[in-house]
Amino acid sequence: MTANKPLLVVIVGPTAVGKTELSIELAKKIGGEIISGDSIQVYRGMDIGTAKVTKEEMQGVPHYLIDILDPDEPFSAFAFKERAQKLITEITERGHIPIIAGGTGLYIQSLIYDYPFDKEEISPEKEQEVKEKMAQLESLSNEALHDYLKSFDPDSAEDIHPNNRKRVLRAVEYYLKTKKLLSYRKKTVQFTENYDTLLIGVEMSREILYQRINCRVDSMLEHGLLQEVEQLMNQGYTSCQSMQAIGYKELIPAVNHEIPINQAVDKLKQHSRNYAKRQMTWFKNKMDVQWFDRAQTSLPLILDEITARIKKRRES
């Protein structure tokens, strides 16, 4: 353990690569408890589209931050960090090892580093002004909104894909509230590690991964994904931010009979493959991850290697 910091194991990798299975088997082997790092698995009723772990798959291993909110409730990197930090402390005090399974790059980064979240107080008048401006911007297309961000913060615009509307809006809102550029803030922040973190990455060749993604989408549909989306829409969640997640937004037009189901499925597969590619790029460029090829290395071998590294850290 480094400088008395709690040990934290984080398992990252692209969608459909096998993080869930690895995290559960590792938890069983080392006495771990799992904290989901997924921003959508927190929502009740969004099960099939998020490949949410089932009670049977958990095999008795404790899981946290799953099914804790309704789809219309907000969830952010800051909210994740607050909840996860508390859980890590509790798990460590029980003598177990906390394992973060999956998650977006920002969520993981905000947790393992002393990542600052601005809490600047602004007047009610300014708050209302920003709220009205954001409401106006909501009507813009993804491209137009991205161009607006580019007009005052080109570095953030370059870092954020135009289709990642949530992050674009976050960068715009940050500027409107603080008159500071999010990109400048990121460049000037000095990160301090909160934990003795072992970052484990799972990967495989693009060809194999894309095949797995396509098969997973087909399996989701066979298990009722379309019906899950329709049920969420019937409950009034259609316009919620959570429904903009991959696996849901693509099927809404199909449920509304605006496009054929096969066209929606093709979009879902394409978006999932694109997302997997972005995930790999982010983790390989931004974080010091120890990678294992899941297609080339057996699960027992990976588990033995991770266990050996954990033992080494505990002894150092």
Swiss-Prot record:
Transmembrane segments: none annotated. Residues 38-41 are annotated as: Interaction with substrate tRNA. Keywords: ATP-binding, Magnesium, Nucleotide-binding, Transferase, tRNA processing. GO terms for biological process: tRNA modification. It is an enzyme of class 2 (transferase). ATP binds at residues 13-20. Its EC number is 2.5.1.75. GO terms for molecular function: ATP binding; tRNA dimethylallyltransferase activity. It comes from the Bacteria. It catalyses: adenosine(37) in tRNA + dimethylallyl diphosphate = N(6)-dimethylallyladenosine(37) in tRNA + diphosphate. Monomer. Catalyzes the transfer of a dimethylallyl group onto the adenine at position 37 in tRNAs that read codons beginning with uridine, leading to the formation of N6-(dimethylallyl)adenosine (i(6)A). This is tRNA dimethylallyltransferase. The gene is miaA.
